[in-house]
Curated annotation (Swiss-Prot):
It comes from the Eukaryota. This is Putative UPF0377 protein YNR075C-A. It comes from Saccharomyces cerevisiae (strain ATCC 204508 / S288c). Belongs to the UPF0377 family.
Length: 30
């Protein structure tokens, strides 16, 4: 998965858990 979707999802908190798996979601939380 490209990291390009991370900055975009940072703006929308609902986008992170919707497009990224739980493992990645935990990384964004930290």
């Amino acid at each position: 998965m490209p990291i390009i979707g991370v900055p975009r999802c940072l703006e929308n908190p609902f986008c992170a858990p919707a497009k990224f798996p739980l493992s990645v979601k935990k990384k964004i939380r930290i």
